[in-house]
């Protein structure tokens, strides 16, 4: 089972609508009855520029640092990042905003509160600092639509193999 913790601390059971292992995105559904939720506003990265201030919201290290906010700037608007395992190329916003384990999947927002990306990764290697990445809303929107409509990303090649032990 999956649970979601809302910004006010309310814990809700969630249903997995769909997920995409290539982009590490998942779509969850909760029952909104009586929760007084406000929908996020999403915005294209086209209105963003290098050096714009952005905020990352997440739970670095887990629930202990619930709903932490870090601030930084956009270092690159359309950085192509290739997954070394799958070869898939994602279009990302590069930012110096602190992105830590637990932030992944949280929103990257502009100063108007619009979600412009979904935090996804950072470079962790000697000689690199403050290189975080967020999948742009423009890249994520069609994936999220496919997850909502089909439970998976349509027209992406998959290899469905089941393994069994030979007796």
Q: Which residues does each predicted region cover?
A:
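Serine-dependent protease modules
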Residues: 1-167
